[in-house]
C-alpha cells in the first residue's frame, strides 16, 4: 500500500512544467503558442465529441433527425436537403474559406492553416470545416447533385427572391443584399418550431453548423 496526496491543477501547471510561453510566437504562423494550443484543443474536442463548444451545440441523433423530417410538410427532395444539412449540426466547425466535395470529409476537424484572405483567422491554424456558403453548397451537392457555386454573392445570383410566406425547407436566406455589407451570411430555412418561430440551419462563425 502507498499513501497518495492528489492536488487538482489547471493548464498553467503543465505549461510551467514544460516551460511553454503562451505569449511567444508559434513557429511559421502569426499566432501565439496559447492560440495554437486553444485551436488544437478545439480540433481534438471536435474529433472526440463532435463539438468544440462544450456541449452547447450537440449533434442531432438519428432518432431526432427522423422525427424532425417527419414533421416537415414538403417534398422528398427538400427533406433530403434537410437530412444532409442537419447531419452536420454539431459535427463540422466553421472555417473561413472552407469548401468540400459531396459526402463526409475525413479532413474535417483536423488542424489546418487558414489561407483565404479577409478574416481575422487568416494565417492561423483552425479545425478544418466549412464556411457559410461552403456549407450550403455542400448540402445541395450532397443531397441533389446541384451546385450553387462558391460565395454568397454567386449563390445570390443563382437564386431569385420569394416572399416570407413562400419559404419552404431548403430555401436560402441571406443576411443582406450582396455589396451592402462587408461580409454576408447565407442560411438554409428549416421550417418552424412548435411555437411558430422560424428555424435556420447554417454554418456560423466561431461555432460551426447549428440549427437555431
Model segments located where?
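Intrinsically disordered, low-complexity, compositionally biased regions/tails
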Residues: 23, 38, 54, 59, ...
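Intrinsically disordered, low-complexity segments enriched in small/polar residues
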Residues: 17, 32, 48, 53, ...
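Membrane-proximal envelope biogenesis segments
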Residues: 1-72
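...with weaker cross-activation on analogous glycine-rich loops/strands in unrelated enzymes
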Residues: 137, 141-211
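Short linear motifs in intrinsically disordered/low-complexity regions
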Residues: 11, 132, 155-158
Amino acid at each position: 500500500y502507498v499513501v497518495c496526496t492528489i492536488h487538482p491543477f489547471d493548464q498553467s501547471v503543465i505549461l510551467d512544467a514544460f516551460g511553454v510561453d503562451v505569449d511567444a510566437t508559434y513557429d511559421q504562423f502569426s499566432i501565439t503558442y496559447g492560440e495554437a494550443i486553444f485551436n488544437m484543443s478545439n480540433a481534438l474536442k471536435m474529433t472526440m465529441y463532435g463539438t468544440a463548444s462544450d456541449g452547447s451545440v450537440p449533434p442531432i441523433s438519428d432518432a431526432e433527425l427522423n422525427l424532425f423530417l417527419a414533421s416537415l410538410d414538403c417534398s422528398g427532395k427538400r427533406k433530403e436537403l434537410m437530412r444532409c444539412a442537419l447531419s452536420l449540426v454539431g459535427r463540422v466547425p466553421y472555417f473561413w474559406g472552407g469548401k468540400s466535395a459531396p459526402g463526409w470529409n475525413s479532413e474535417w476537424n483536423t488542424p489546418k492553416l487558414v489561407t483565404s484572405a479577409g478574416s481575422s483567422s487568416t494565417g492561423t491554424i483552425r479545425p478544418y470545416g466549412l464556411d457559410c456558403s461552403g456549407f450550403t453548397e455542400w448540402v445541395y451537392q450532397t443531397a441533389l447533385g446541384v451546385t450553387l457555386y462558391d460565395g454568397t454573392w454567386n449563390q445570390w445570383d443563382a437564386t431569385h427572391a420569394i416572399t416570407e410566406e413562400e419559404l419552404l425547407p431548403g430555401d436560402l436566406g441571406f443576411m443582406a443584399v450582396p455589396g451592402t455589407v462587408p461580409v454576408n451570411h447565407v442560411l438554409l430555412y428549416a421550417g418552424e418550431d412548435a411555437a411558430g418561430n422560424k428555424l435556420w440551419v447554417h454554418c456560423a462563425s466561431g461555432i460551426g453548423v447549428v440549427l437555431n
